[in-house]
């Protein structure tokens, strides 16, 4: 059975880059454009891993991550923050919100795929 990855990203081009990177793998890919859609997608089908952009409309990645990690049934899902928000301390803020890892944009597809495999192996 293939592992499920939820890609939470509001930029279509960024979703496409991630989708293109994951298509050759055996992962099942679901997508959401904001934190609210992510929570709805998780309620329908629990992912094995979440790639979470931080700057999202409606509900940002921090708020969505906090909601996911507050739920005992969901808190074990690894969340990798993928963000172009390049403030000093951004990784620490993401981890404080509950993200398990952090990958800055632009990212190396090889680096991101290695992190995904690390959490799904």
Task: Explain the meaning of each model-derived region.
Residues 107-116:
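C-terminal output helix
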Residues 45-51, 56:
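Active-site beta3 strand of CheY-like receiver
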Residues 12-30, 44, 119:
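Two-component/phosphorelay signaling modules centered on CheY-like receiver
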Residues 9:
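Conserved acidic carboxylate
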Residues 57, 75, 87, 105-106:
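The feature encodes the CheY-like receiver
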Residues 32-33, 56-59, 68, 89:
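Hydrophobic residue at a beta-alpha junction
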């Amino acid at each position: 059975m293939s592992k499920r990855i939820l890609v939470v990203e509001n930029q279509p081009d960024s979703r496409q880059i991630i989708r293109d990177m994951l298509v050759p793998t055996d992962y099942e890919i679901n997508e959401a454009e904001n934190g609210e859609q992510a929570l709805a997608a998780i309620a329908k089908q629990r992912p094995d891993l979440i790639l979470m952009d931080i700057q999202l409309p409606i509900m940002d990645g921090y708020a969505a991550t906090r909601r996911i990690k507050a739920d005992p049934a969901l808190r074990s899902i690894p969340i990798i923050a993928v963000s172009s928000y390049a403030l000093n301390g951004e990784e620490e803020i993401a981890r404080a919100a509950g993200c398990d890892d952090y990958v800055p944009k632009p990212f190396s597809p090889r680096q991101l795929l290695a992190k995904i495999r690390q959490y799904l192996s």
